[in-house]
Amino acid sequence: MSISLINTKNLIFYGFKSGFKSGFQNIYQSILSSLYAKQIKALMALVLLSGAMIMTVTSATVQANELMPNVSDGKLQRLDVQALPFELIKPRPIDVWLPADYPAKAPYAVIYMHDGKMLFDASQSWNNTAWEVDETAAQLNQQDDIKSFIVVGIHNADASRHSEYFPQKPFESLTADKQTSLYQTQRSETEKLLAQAVYSDQYAEFIVTELKPYIDGHFKVATDKQNTFIMGSSMGGLISWYTALEYPHVFGGAACLSTHWPGSFAQNGNPIPQVFNQYLARKIAEKPQVKLYFDYGDQTLDAMYPPLQAKVDKLFEASDYDKSLWQTHYFKGKAHTESAWAERLNIPLTFLLQK
């Protein structure tokens, strides 16, 4: 997603709505009784109309200026950003992958995936690697023991990705001092870890109340929880289990690859994994009947995960959660990369979609 386009839209919208418009109205009111009131009124109308036109054009360019990924199998459609309300999150491209024979095997299950720009086309991603979702999905769609399915790829919020994907209720259970510390943490010299207040509840609500109804109404899909799944990696893994457990009546399962259990990049004295586990323990006790897939490697960023995933596994093992509904896989020697996730993508998809 082009953050410059998104930010431009918001700057124009908010500047126009609160400052730009009110500023001209104040000027106008102050000279309303003057000799030139009619001329000023006409000028103001022209300026406001121009602002509205700029807003409309800029909204459209969120979609138009973002290159469409190329796929080697199936076909890809980009949703019209103006067809969705986007009342809860910033507009961004959303791509829908369809099997080559769509809609012959309708109704289809739906996999909602995060980090949509990284899913299909390595030439479009920031690091020139991709999940190669189209290739794996096309192969699985040919198997009789797998539900036919489509994939909805939601592009992320760029600099605000961490704020959008960090599970909100666990975050809010941290002490005020720890929350403040996280908001002050720098990801790099120029970028904060959390670019804005954590808003993953809004993101999850967007998927459930804005995006899913649109997909259900415009594509030949099954709409029940047994055919609705969510999936992501790293921070996308966190938001996947969180969304599925917040909406267990909507999602039948979540796949969480290389789940970023630390929540930040601190290795010592980090309370975040503990609040995640406390949240999970409460949800597990509710027996939500949701499939949960976890995996991890042991190289690069994944080297942080083995002991943390082990604690999560113990929660499930100690509970009476249906053992057929969750599984964890360890991939020795694998790193925190799209190519590693692409290699094993068939495993979580099979777990979720097995007939």
Regions found by a protein language model. Give the residues of each.
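Bacterial N-terminal signal peptides that target proteins for export
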Residues: 8, 12, 16-47
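Non-catalytic cap/lid and distal C-terminal segments of serine-dependent acyl enzymes
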Residues: 65-355
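Residues at secondary-structure transition points
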Residues: 21, 25, 29, 57-58, ...
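Bacterial N-terminal signal peptides
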Residues: 44-56
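Boundary at the C-terminal end of the N-terminal hydrophobic targeting segment
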Residues: 59-64
